[in-house]
Amino acid sequence: MIKLIVGLGNPGAEYTATRHNAGFWLVDQLAREAGATLRDERRFHGFYAKARLFGEEVHLLEPQTYMNRSGQAVVALAHFFKILPTEILVAHDELDLPPGAAKLKLGGGSGGHNGLKDISAHLSSQQYWRLRIGIGHPRDLIPESARAGAKPDVANFVLKPPRKDEQDLINAAIERALAVMPTAIKGETERAMMQLHRNGA
């Protein structure tokens, strides 16, 4: 059973529409569907809501610590409510998936994502669920003929808003992810993963 859903991003209006905040977009949508309001909760270092989702009580969290300190917020809430790593789902932007893709998985490395790296360090575990929301990679924007030796600026890419066509694809992937949330929250995470991946995400 999933008891805590965390969306990763950076705080502040200047980051709201940037690719790195894709995790926030998903949690915002979940809060809207539940009729819940995310409020600043200092003890959890983020915006927090306790929501009733699909018949289950679920904690929603958007850390306001900046991405590379996300673990501080996650561990504070997890310890307070005695939530195990395997009961946590972290939604985050994923460079290695194209816009329009979303994948669910348990455990694994950080893939260079500083938010995941910090969460794993604070939880002393990598065994939490990740919802990877594809944003594409800046190398994909470089013509193939010019890719040899090119060094794409990843930091600049994730801190910029997606193009309109990319945003539409990302929104569609988030909708598909939301459609399997009832299954995941009730503890049928493997089934939710199969449904999401089968639906072309």
Swiss-Prot record:
Active site: 20 (proton acceptor)
Lineage, highest ranks first: Bacteria, Pseudomonadati, Pseudomonadota, Betaproteobacteria, Burkholderiales
Keywords: Cytoplasm, Hydrolase, RNA-binding, tRNA-binding
One GO cellular component term noted in the UniProt record for this chain: cytoplasm
Gene Ontology terms for molecular function: peptidyl-tRNA hydrolase activity; tRNA binding
Statement: the UniProt record of this protein carries the keyword Protease: no
PANTHER family: PEPTIDYL-TRNA HYDROLASE
Localization per record: Cytoplasm
The organism's place on the tree of life at top rank: Bacteria
Naturally occurring in which organism (per UniProt): Burkholderia pseudomallei (strain K96243)
This enzyme's EC code(s): 3.1.1.29
UniProt site positions, description: Discriminates between blocked and unblocked aminoacyl-tRNA: 10
Assembly notes: Monomer.
GO terms (BP aspect): protein quality control for misfolded or incompletely synthesized proteins; rescue of stalled ribosome
Broad class of enzyme this protein falls into: hydrolase
InterPro entries: Pept_tRNA_hydro, Pept_tRNA_hydro_CS, Pept_tRNA_hydro_sf
Task of the protein: Hydrolyzes ribosome-free peptidyl-tRNAs (with 1 or more amino acids incorporated), which drop off the ribosome during protein synthesis, or as a result of ribosome stalling. Catalyzes the release of premature peptidyl moieties from peptidyl-tRNA molecules trapped in stalled 50S ribosomal subunits, and thus maintains levels of free tRNAs and 50S ribosomes.
Protein name: Peptidyl-tRNA hydrolase
Catalysed reaction equations from the record: an N-acyl-L-alpha-aminoacyl-tRNA + H2O = an N-acyl-L-amino acid + a tRNA + H(+)
Site (Stabilizes the basic form of H active site to accept a proton): 93
Similarity comment: family membership: Belongs to the PTH family.
Binding site for tRNA: 15, 66, 68, 114
